[in-house]
Design a protein with these regions (language model features):
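Core structural elements
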Residues: 24-37, 56-68, 85-106, 160
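Acidic, turn-prone loop/beta-hairpin segments
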Residues: 43-73, 102-178
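Residues that scaffold the ATP/ADP-binding catalytic core of kinase and kinase-like folds
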Residues: 1, 99, 145
């Protein structure tokens, strides 16, 4: 994630703190993926549950994922690599890891099989899409993590770029959640 914060046409200086931040981000992503994988049953098959099973936090994270996918696509279309990298970094660190995984933990351990299954499905779905969005910036790490996901294809490189899915857009839930 060394391109995070870079601007088109400008040289970047080597900054040790930026290297440390990139290492910390990769470690955070690696640990988040390990957490998700260790909470999946062996017979898990990926796929989002029906909308009526999603709770407010699920709708919130899916809305945020939609927003970051749309914004990153626009940034990359305009060759704004630094902005795109910053957006996926912020989404993975701040939204997915710091909030959604923490919110999902009680559901995973609640004893309610349906709630736990819904949480697992959303965790895997969002992680899959986030890895695809991050892939241009961290190809080796994202490939390794993607291969560990259940139902993953041969390689992340041949997968479709995540696009905005209007069916996963809940602005009311997003506003109420925040």
């Amino acid at each position: 994630m060394l391109v995070d914060g870079s601007t088109p046409g400008n040289d970047m200086r080597y900054i040790e703190k930026k290297v440390e931040a990139a290492r910390n981000f990769a470690n955070k992503l690696w640990n988040a993926t390990r957490f998700v994988l260790m909470n999946l049953p062996e017979d898990f098959t990926p796929g989002l549950p029906s909308e009526d099973k999603l709770d407010m936090s699920d709708k919130w994270v899916l809305t945020k994922l939609n927003q970051v996918a749309g914004a990153m696509t626009d940034n990359l279309d305009h060759y704004e690599m630094g902005l795109a990298a910053a957006k996926i970094n912020s989404f993975i660190w701040d939204v997915y890891c710091d909030w959604f995984i923490e919110i999902a933990k009680p559901r995973l351990n609640s004893g309610d099989a349906e709630q736990a299954d819904t949480a697992r499905r959303v965790l895997v779905y969002v992680l899959d899409k986030a890895l695809k969005l991050l892939h241009p910036f961290m190809p080796f790490v994202t490939e390794e993590l993607y291969q560990a996901l259940p139902g993953s294809a041969e390689t992340i490189m041949t997968q479709e770029w995540p696009t905005v899915d209007e069916a996963h857009n809940w602005p009311e839930e997003e506003e109420a959640f925040e």
